[in-house]
């Protein structure tokens, strides 16, 4: 009912036209989608502009689109990329909102119950709500998500039904309006005003919707809305004056009072059945445990309308039958939406594996009286359920997996790069003397201001090689799994800027990562078969050198394995196609020129330091409270901007700095507690 308020078409803002294999791929994908095909593989070599191809396709088809990536970092990169493609349309980001998550679990062997423990990232939570709000109010929506999109979410019909529009001139009493906000699970807080709260000041009501960054001020004249204003949440400055505003629930699990009453009746019935089961089996401890916990949750739902862990009762709240799949993000899309699975060789198996792990954990909780059996139905979709809901799917990968290849009636190939760059030349060298040979090759690249990636099989070998190269005078660093995202970004930035010439690691795939300065990828012990030396891993690793005009890959091996041969044959096939095209069209390969910030702009700005100049100049014992508060407001504004740009690590860094300042300078004397954010 709200979708006529927004445009229905996508408008692509590209600085260039389709080139290379892109026009052919766009045409073929469009034809196959419009003819009704449900599974299509886009086999795109590294650097051929697969994301741009999908952007042009979305503009042509004008359908809501879900893009699934296999981790948050890649999802953020894609969201940032598509926001640049579609600045006038809704490009949303939907991932898990937990910075830290320990699910509820029970270990029977040690009789250990682990309480749910989680740290929620409020900025990511806002973006999740904005994604569902956009899907319910407009057609021109692209949502970039992780597997979070297959996990249980409240019913979209209830979420939509609960939302309402406030307009200037509307007759509504302040009391009724406050009741509506409370029913939508917004909290009244006249002091600590933050997202998800509302406050009252005379005839003025202010609310920060969970999916917005601004404050909505509703000015009343008696029982009539006189003005609707949008304000900056920190400064209070006027951003705009509106004719009306949409208010959606503060929780995806909101439901009507009638539904909740019915659900509570059903929960009590199931509880009694389960208690009889435990008592028949003389499991009195389990019975008492379940009764105490469930009755407590029911009392909270009756009094407040919700409880902690209410999602475990979602089957009853939604009115679903036992075993019926839960609602999830997919149910918020229109029926004709398009799904794009990025790096499908990784993402498809990931989607398929979520259900089994969740079931195993929940089963132990149910059997030992910590949860009702219906809690098992608060789960991710199994793969068949996912496949039934997504309709038409495009699988995107340089190395498609067996599943997607078996489902697709032939692949759409995108081999030719718009830049004219060809796949790297591959050379196989003997293992004997590989380190000395590698050192010589590194020195050659150093003279040309080029960079090198080296992949090893073991952590120990990577560490020893890093030490050896460092002693030999090479600017080298070791990239390993213990390095956090920000430090990883700093190392990659240092590599691109030339502060580091070589990166050594075990798994340097990082699909989707652009390192145009890398001209050599060295694969040590290439003939040791395993998942790090599989055909897929080889092709992905080879792709790290495909963005340089002089890209080469050196495989150190004494034997030619099947995986090596397949990856070499496929790379050479692509290389021949690319070279033939360049000769025929008179194309000269052009080096990729990409600013260093482009690779990391979603995660962090290079050498980004929080501005603490004010703090450095303040004498600690006699701190100026007003100055500190002013500085905190400035940092909060920067944090909101960083989160809006999907730079969540930067936003988190700012958040931690704000928390530290509040604890150090603003905590009340005698208080041992933490300042609530």
UniProtKB/Swiss-Prot annotation:
Record's GO cellular component terms: cytoplasm; excinuclease repair complex
Entry superkingdom: Bacteria
Residues reported in the UniProt entry to bind ATP: 44-51
Disulfide bonds: none
Keywords: ATP-binding, Cytoplasm, DNA damage, DNA excision, DNA repair, Excision nuclease, Nucleotide-binding, SOS response
Keyword set includes ATP-binding: yes
Pfam families noted in UniProt: Helicase_C, ResIII, UVR, UvrB, UvrB_inter
Main subcellular location of this protein, as a coarse class: cytoplasm
GO molecular function: ATP binding; ATP hydrolysis activity; DNA binding; excinuclease ABC activity
Gene Ontology BP terms: nucleotide-excision repair; SOS response
Domain Helicase C-terminal span(s) in chain numbering: 434-596
Motif window: Beta-hairpin: 97-120
NCBIfam families membership: PRK05298.1, uvrb
Function: The UvrABC repair system catalyzes the recognition and processing of DNA lesions. A damage recognition complex composed of 2 UvrA and 2 UvrB subunits scans DNA for abnormalities. Upon binding of the UvrA(2)B(2) complex to a putative damaged site, the DNA wraps around one UvrB monomer. DNA wrap is dependent on ATP binding by UvrB and probably causes local melting of the DNA helix, facilitating insertion of UvrB beta-hairpin between the DNA strands. Then UvrB probes one DNA strand for the presence of a lesion.
Domain note: The beta-hairpin motif is involved in DNA binding.
Family to which the UniProt record says this protein belongs: Belongs to the UvrB family.
Assembly and binders: Forms a heterotetramer with UvrA during the search for lesions. Interacts with UvrC in an incision complex.
Protein name stated in the entry: UvrABC system protein B
Source organism of the structure: Tropheryma whipplei (strain TW08/27) (Whipple's bacillus)
């Amino acid at each position: 009912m709200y979708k006529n308020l927004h445009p229905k078409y996508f408008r692509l803002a590209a600085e260039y036209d389709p080139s290379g294999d892109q026009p052919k791929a766009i045409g073929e994908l469009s034809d196959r989608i419009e003819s009704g095909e449900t599974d299509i593989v886009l086999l795109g070599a590294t650097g051929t502009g697969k994301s741009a191809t999908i952007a042009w396709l979305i503009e042509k088809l004008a359908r809501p689109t879900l893009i699934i990536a296999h981790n948050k970092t890649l999802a953020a990169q894609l969201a940032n990329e598509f926001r640049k493609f579609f600045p006038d349309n809704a490009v949303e980001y939907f991932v898990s909102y937990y910075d830290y998550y320990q699910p509820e679990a029970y270990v029977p062997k040690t009789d250990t119950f682990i309480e749910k423990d989680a740290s929620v990232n409020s900025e990511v939570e806002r973006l999740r709500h904005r994604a569902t709000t956009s899907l319910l109010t407009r057609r021109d929506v692209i949502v970039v998500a992780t597997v979070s999109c297959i996990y249980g979410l409240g019913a979209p019909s209830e979420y939509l039904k609960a939302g309402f529009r406030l307009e200037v001139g509307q007759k509504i009493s302040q009391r009724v309006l406050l009741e509506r906000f409370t029913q939508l699970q917004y909290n009244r807080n006249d002091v600590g005003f933050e997202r998800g709260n509302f406050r009252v000041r005379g005839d003025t009501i202010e609310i920060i919707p969970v999916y917005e960054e601004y404050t909505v001020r509703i000015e009343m004249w008696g029982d009539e809305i006189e003005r609707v204003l949008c304000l900056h949440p920190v400064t209070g400055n006027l951003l705009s004056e509106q004719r009306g505003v949409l208010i959606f629930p503060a929780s995806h699990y909101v439901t009507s009072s009638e539904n909740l009453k019915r659900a509570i009746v059903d929960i009590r019935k199931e509880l009694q059945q389960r208690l009889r089961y435990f008592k028949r089996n003389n499991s009195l401890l389990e019975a008492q445990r379940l009764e105490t916990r469930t009755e407590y949750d029911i009392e909270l739902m009756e009094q407040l309308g919700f409880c902690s862990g209410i999602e475990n009762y979602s089957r009853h709240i939604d009115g679903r039958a036992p075993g019926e799949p839960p609602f999830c993000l997919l149910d918020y899309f229109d029926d004709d939406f398009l799904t794009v699975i990025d790096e499908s060789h990784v993402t498809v198996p990931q989607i398929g594996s979520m259900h089994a792990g969740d079931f195993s954990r929940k089963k132990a909780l149910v059997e030992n009286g910590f949860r009702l059996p219906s809690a098992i139905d608060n789960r991710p979709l199994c793969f068949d359920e996912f496949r039934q809901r997504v309709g038409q799917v495009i699988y995107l990968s340089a190395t498609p997996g067996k599943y997607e290849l078996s489902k697709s009636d032939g692949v759409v190939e995108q081999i030719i790069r718009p830049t004219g760059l060809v796949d790297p030349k591959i050379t196989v060298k003997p293992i004997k003397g590989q380190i000395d040979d590698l050192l010589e090759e590194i020195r050659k690249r150093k003279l040309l201001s080029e960079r090198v990636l080296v992949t090893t099989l073991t952590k120990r070998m990577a560490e020893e090689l890093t030490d050896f190269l460092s002693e030999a005078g090479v600017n080298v660093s070791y990239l390993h799994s213990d390095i956090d995202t920000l430090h990883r970004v700093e190392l990659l930035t240092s590599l691109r800027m030339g502060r580091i010439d070589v990166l050594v690691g075990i798994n340097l795939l990082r699909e989707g990562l652009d390192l145009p300065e890398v001209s050599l990828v060295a694969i040590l012990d290439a003939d040791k078969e395993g998942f790090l030396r599989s055909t897929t891993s080889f092709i992905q690793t080879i792709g790290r050198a495909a963005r340089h005009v002089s890209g080469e890959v050196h495989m150190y091996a004494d034997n030619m394995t099947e995986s090596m041969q397949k990856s070499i044959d496929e790379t050479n096939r692509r290389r021949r196609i690319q070279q033939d095209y360049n000769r025929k069209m008179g194309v000269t390969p052009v080096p990729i020129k990409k600013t260093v910030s482009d690779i990391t702009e979603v995660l962090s700005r290079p050498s980004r330091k929080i501005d603490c100049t004010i703090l450095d100049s303040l004498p600690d014992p006699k701190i100026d409270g007003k100055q500190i508060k002013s500085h905190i407001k400035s940092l909060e504004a920067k944090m909101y901007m960083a989160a809006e740009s999907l730079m969540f690590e930067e936003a988190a860094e700012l958040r931690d700095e704000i928390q530290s300042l509040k604890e150090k300078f603003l905590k009340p004397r005698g208080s041992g507690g933490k300042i609530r954010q």
